[in-house]
UniProtKB/Swiss-Prot annotation:
InterPro entries: EF-Ts_dimer_sf (IPR036402), Transl_elong_EFTs/EF1B (IPR001816), Transl_elong_EFTs/EF1B_dimer (IPR014039), Transl_elong_Ts_CS (IPR018101), UBA-like_sf (IPR009060). Keywords: Cytoplasm, Elongation factor, Protein biosynthesis. Its main location: cytoplasm. One of its GO terms (cellular component) is cytoplasm. GO terms for molecular function: translation elongation factor activity. Belongs to the EF-Ts family. Residues 80-83 are annotated as: Involved in Mg(2+) ion dislocation from EF-Tu. This is Elongation factor Ts. Associates with the EF-Tu.GDP complex and induces the exchange of GDP to GTP. It remains bound to the aminoacyl-tRNA.EF-Tu.GTP complex up to the GTP hydrolysis stage on the ribosome. It is found in: Cytoplasm. It holds the Pfam family EF_TS.
Amino acid sequence: MAEITASLVKELRDRTGAGMMECKKALVEANGDIELAIDNMRKSGQAKAAKKAGRVAAEGVILARVENGFGVLVEMNCETDFVAKDAGFLGLANEVADFAAANKGTTIEALQAQFEEKRAALVAKIGENMNIRRVAYLDGQVIAQYLHGAKIGVLVAGEGSDDELKKVAMHVAASKPEFVNPEDVSAEVVEHERQIQIDIAINSGKPKEIAEKMVEGRMKKFTGEVSLTGQAFVMDPSVSVGDFLKSVNTSVSNFIRLEVGEGIEKKEEDFAAEVAKITGGNA
């Protein structure tokens, strides 16, 4: 039996909005598998669509470079927001971004090796760990970029107006689509959601045959919600992004979205533990 920690229960609660006891029970039944617990809670009606995993806990910056139909995003992490604003840290991050832009296709491993000496020297000087975490490249006829406070970076590739594609990049930053078009949603993702929706309908008392028919409409809504062109446009929710693009004679072929610290969790201590640590006592 997997250990059900308080932090795991809290994460499930944050992602589902369900009560603490319901979350703990679901985790016990799923043997600590949070994704399985979410699926089971959705099937039983205890939770609706869950928030995506990947609480942002690390600090750092996202930098972008765009030129002549080519763009690159680089993420560099550190431990505190204070260091994320340090001139030395930002200087190194900009060097990395410039190098990645000038050497298209450089892998993250190659980037890390290229700047390891400078990184180690800066760590020794500042006294805080830092690392070059991710690099992502995008090609296209037109590349638009959007940076939200150096914490979220988006590149959008397409054809048409750069100004209109930048609006779409802002939408991607806010709405986090996973695919470009509804038809791009992978068969595996669609089938997983379909089975959940069928179980939800059956658990509500519907016969299996009727449940399966009901699900088709729900699946169309689901693929629209997770795809860029199917989402309601943040700047005008009365139209979809797809309709907006058609109205301005612009199209999107691909996009990349990076957010500082996605998928990284810092070690957290409760307040009592922090006090005990400071005073040398026990919590």
